[in-house]
Amino acid sequence: MSHLDQVIDQEKPDRRIVVAALGVTQILAWGSTFYLLGVLANEIARNTGWSYDWVTSGVSVGLLMAGVVSPRVGRAISKWGGRLTLAVSAVLLAAGLLLLGSCQSIAWYLVAWLLLGAGMGSGLTDAAFSTLGSIYGENARGPITSLTLFAGFASTVCWPLSAYLIEHLGWRGACFIYAAIQIGFALPILLLALPRGPSVPPPTADDEGARSRASLASGELPIFALLAVVLTLSAAIFSMVGIHLLPLLQARGLELSAAVGLGAIVGPSQVGARIVEMLIGRHYHPIWTMISSAVLVAAGTALLFAAFPTYSAAIVLYGAGNGLGSVARGTLALALFGSSRYPVLMGHLALPILMSMALSPFLASIAFQVKGATLTLGLIAFLGATNVLLVGLLWILCRRRPTAAEID
């Protein structure tokens, strides 16, 4: 073992500490950005007189900005590790929340979301996955799967917290408290728990297989492009269902309380599927996790479209598939392209994923308003079925690689 390897091994922290630190900070980051307006939007619109549509567009603005910065974030994590990048994210989120809480016009409100978007792009799921890849290399699959368990509790933790803060401090006070949490709690945790640099040694100049961390061989380009399409389509389905599930169920004749009860099934279904993956996933290639995810999501959305007598079965299937999809999003690229290129490639994959999450709810909203719930659910089911075919093609391409034996 070289001196560099010894230093890296000594500085590599306990996986449980790193995953716990990232898990807690991911809950806070998601809860103070993507899930923030789920509770604050109505209060902001009522208090300011701004259009509700303009208020809720803040998340889309943030996701678009996150997509723009994500490729640079991947390169930064590849070069310097995730500690500095995630710390910068906490500072950006705090600054964005401070501006959000003090803004007096819709223009400054959207500027605040641009700042929050920069923090989202440098600190949410893909950045956290890339950080784990830079620390643990080829052994990052287990930590990535464990981290996804935490993410499923972001709304569970932060929606009640946001509601409590609004009741006692108002929406502006809630933003200020979340800003303080980012600086006073999340930032120190990240600085203390994460190593100073990547634990995966950088490629040397004479390493022909690593001339560039982002380079792809000609045979890898179709696989990477198809993986990007699959993940983007998966993100579109997730965003459409996540935003419109309750209104779609109500349009099908369900009462609000019944729709909310069904929607609550998604979270436990996601976590349950991730626990199963954590227990048995190491025994098979991540492409099978992706296949399982696509099939379950397609089955769930098809049953929703068909008005299956038991909606709960459809939502359990969808939730389980979505939960596995989050794991596959973090582990499949690692398995296909290796750890040295992983942070950079994850940054490039995050760009279309985040753009899709920002724009697809608008498309679903237009379909819902113009053609109604049945056509909208049909569109989502069609996308789910299409993704199964694309994942099947991805499996075929992966099997043709020289290392395809491990996929069987």
Q: Residue ranges of each PLM-predicted region?
A:
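Hydrophobic core of transmembrane alpha-helices in multi-pass small-molecule transporters
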Residues: I27, A107-G123, T232, Y311-L324
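Helix-to-loop junctions at the C-terminal end of transmembrane segments
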Residues: V69-G81, A273-H285, F368
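Intracellular juxtamembrane helix-capping segments at the cytosolic ends
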Residues: S122-Y136, L324-F337
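Helix-loop-helix hairpin linking two adjacent transmembrane segments in secondary transporters
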Residues: F150-G197
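C-terminal transmembrane helical hairpin of 12-TM major facilitator-type secondary transporters
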Residues: V266, Q270, H283-L332
